[in-house]
Amino acid sequence: MPGPGSTLRLLAAVLALALLAAACGDSSGGAGTATPASPSSTSGSPTTVAAPSSSTEPSTTTTVVAPTVNLTEGCVENYTEGVDYFPQKLTVEDAERLGVTYEDNYKVVRVSDANFEEAAFTYVLVQCGTPAPELTDDLAGATVVEVPISSAVVMSTTMLPGLAEIGRLDIVKGLDSFDYVSTPAVLDLIEAGDLVATGSLSFGFDAEAMAAAEPDVAFTFLFGPAADELAPLEGLGIPAAVSADYRENTPLGRAEWMKFPALFINEEAAVTDLYDGIATEYGDLVEKAATAAERPTVLLDKATDGVWNVAGGGSYAARFIADAGGDYIFSDVEGNSSEQLDIETVLERASDADFWLNPGFGVSSLMDLEAADPRHAKFAAFERGDVWNNDLRVNANFGNDYFETGAAHPELVLGDLIAILHPELAPDHEFVFYRRLQ
């Protein structure tokens, strides 16, 4: 029989085992295993914003999926502050009189030097269904337009090719005139009776026709004072979107104005693709022309009543000649406007010019040129038959597609010019706008 000491030792061992078992069974998880933390990811996650909460309610968040493309029709249904509603943006590279900046739900379009008064305009294009900003500081006096617009009257044919090529002629409800249009898809709309003619703002304006078109915007341009020319639209409460494309002095600068109407319909992606292709082809042609062995001399225009309007060396026409690998004889005339010289002065400087381009409206033959002034026949280019006019595509109303499609597609004009000045570089060229006078 065990003694008292043995009994005490046995009780101590049992107590120790009980304490050890209790210690091993005590766990905060109850099962002895930790729950792993949920992984987090920021890749491709939607925009989240915190919903308003009070001190007595639990905080909640609402997941908002930001748009990945611009809304080209309709309005935002549920506006959320902080969401970028213009994920597809554009930049202006070549046009000096057009600019655009973006905020989350509106864009600011600025037009400068729109006429001889150097008129400037600011447009705040607000995504429909979102709040307009306060027009303070540099936005004071801006014209606010909800975009995308669904209807417009276009009072400049230079905008038509771009709208046609991005497939958005659906917004065009009227033109100032049907007479001078060349774009085939627009001619189809005219033939179908789908458009109204409003007359120009400065001559023959038809207020009833303009009102009947119910345009969100009227795209136009200015020659005279802005206050006078835009008054008819202001009287109808129709916003005027003023283009300054014809004030640009480079071919690509003018062509890039196709982006102007596209900004009003949120078609940044489509018009950027179109313009980038044009600019790339134009650049390739400039490089091609630069490989020519010689740079022929070029004369422009003609005399009227013994006076020759000589284009400046910084003009649109002069830039075309330079890019085509030619030397414009009057490149030393400063600026982009013309200088008036008498025909004898021009003869003295340019009688031996290699080529004579753009003698102008109403000159269909060498005979017409000589009839306008017999001294025209004294130029060597006339004697050789190296006189070319840009009137190959003129309609029955004397609308010249050179000023429509040619403005939107300067690469086509440049291709013609290279084929004239450097035929060895384009032996199989088919002319689009130019023809040799006979």
Residue ranges of model-derived segments:
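N-terminal ligand-binding lobe of clamshell/alpha-beta domains
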Residues: G25-D26, P58-Q438
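Hydrophobic helical h-region of N-terminal Sec-dependent signal peptides
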Residues: A13-L17
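Bacterial N-terminal signal peptides that target proteins for export
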Residues: M1-L11
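Bacterial lipoprotein signal-peptidase II cleavage site
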Residues: C24-T35
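Post-signal peptide N-terminal segment of mature Sec-exported envelope proteins
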Residues: T33-T60, V65-G74
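C-terminal motif of bacterial Sec signal peptides marking the signal peptidase cleavage site
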Residues: A18-A23
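Residue-identity detector for glycine
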Residues: G3-G5, G30-G32, G44
